[in-house]
Every structure is written in structure tokens, then in C-alpha cells.
């Protein structure tokens, strides 16, 4: 079953992951066995919504849930395959940095459902994708920043220079320019999805630079 979810179906609220699970049939062997694989700690907000929803479903007895957090992209495929070999029915996670590799795993395990955060299209019959649309609130943030800024200089700190991050930055810049076309922007990438001290350091460096 191919499934692509928009922002109203997936991405906000603790029920999102459970809504995704309902798209798949009940397994004859009993409860659905779900594995979550996350590249950041589960307290990171983007991942937290998935983790909390799946954990709540497990506590209600609806699914069996295991997970791995802070899994590097270089180790992600190995972890995927280990969970597949362990007998899970479904893997939920992120494929932003390993889109092709994750799809290859799905090809090798056709009886397992994959629900992955990913900007590209679904793949085969068992690889479904979701994404968020937070470029829209980023545009609104830009409007506020462009209106409030006295220096016309605005800074942005992101994880990696990839399309999913840059679309947020461009939305922010478009919003700011809609209020003040003379705004200038400083962008810093910290090379991590979750490193609060490094993000703070980058932000202060931008402030000191004006």
C-alpha cells in the first residue's frame, strides 16, 4: 500500500504515528511489532512526536514497540536490517540522509512496512513517506523578524545545507523581505541535527557579528 501524508494527516499531534499504522492490515501473528529508528535523541521535538505516539500505543497494548535513538546515518542501514531480521512488522524513522539506501532495504524486505520521513516519493508497495510543512510558519516568523528588526540583519542556524533545511530558510527570508526588502541574512550550519551547545555558540557568533 502506497501512502503519502500531508501536514494534516501526519506531522502534528501525538496521534500521527498511530494514524499511519491504521493504514496497514492487522497481522495474523498478533500485535504489530514496530521499530523506531531515530538519528537524534527522542527529546528532539521532531522525533518526539513520533516516539511519544508510538510509546503511548505500546502502553495501551496496541503494538509492541522498540527503538534506537542517536543513530548516525552511517550506521542507519545496519540498524534497519537488524530490526528487519529480528521480526518486526514495521519500521518508522527518517531517511533524509539515506533515501536510496533505505529504499534498497525495503526492496530486500518486502513483507515489512516502512514509514519514513523523506522528501521523495513512496517506493514499491511497502515504503511510505511523510514530511512536514513548517516552511509556512517560517514565513510568518520572517514577517515578524522583518518588521521588528532595527538593523535589517537577520541570522539563521541550521543543521545541514540540504533542501529540507534550506526551504525553511528561504521561507523565512521571503517573509522578512515582504516586510523589509533591505534585510540581509547570515546563515550558519552546525553539521548536526541535535547539538544545543553548538547551535547556541553559532547564534552568539552571529549576534557578535552584528
Features from the language model and the residues they span:
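Extracytoplasmic "Venus flytrap"
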Residues: 33-60, 66-76, 96, 161-167
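Periplasmic-binding protein-like
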Residues: 88-95, 115-117, 210
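Short beta-strand elements at the ligand-binding edges of bilobed clamshell
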Residues: 122-147, 156-164
Amino acid at each position: 500500500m502506497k501512502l503519502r501524508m500531508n501536514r494534516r494527516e501526519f506531522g502534528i499531534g501525538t496521534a500521527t504515528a498511530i494514524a499511519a499504522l491504521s493504514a496497514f492490515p492487522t497481522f495474523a501473528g498478533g500485535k504489530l511489532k514496530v521499530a523506531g529508528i531515530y538519528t537524534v535523541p527522542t527529546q528532539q521535538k521532531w522525533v518526539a512526536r513520533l516516539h511519544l505516539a508510538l510509546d503511548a500505543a505500546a502502553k495501551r497494548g496496541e503494538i509492541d514497540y522498540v527503538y534506537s535513538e542517536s543513530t548516525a546515518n552511517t550506521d542507519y542501514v545496519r540498524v534497519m536490517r537488524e530490526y528487519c531480521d529480528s521480526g518486526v512488522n514495521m519500521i518508522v524513522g527518517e531517511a533524509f540522509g539515506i533515501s536510496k539506501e533505505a529504499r534498497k532495504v525495503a526492496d530486500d524486505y518486502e513483507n515489512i512496512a516502512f514509514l519514513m520521513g523523506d522528501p521523495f516519493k513512496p517506493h514499491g508497495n511497502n515504503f511510505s513517506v511523510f514530511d512536514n510543512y513548517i516552511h509556512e510558519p517560517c514565513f510568518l516568523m520572517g514577517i515578524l523578524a522583518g518588521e521588528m528588526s532595527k538593523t535589517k540583519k537577520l541570522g539563521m542556524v541550521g543543521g545541514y545545507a540540504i533542501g529540507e533545511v534550506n526551504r525553511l530558510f528561504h521561507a523565512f527570508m521571503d517573509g522578512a523581505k515582504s516586510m523589509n526588502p533591505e534585510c540581509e541574512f547570515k546563515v550558519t550550519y552546525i553539521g548536526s541535527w541535535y547539538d544545543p551547545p553548538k547551535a547556541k555558540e553559532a547564534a552568539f557568533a552571529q549576534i557578535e557579528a552584528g
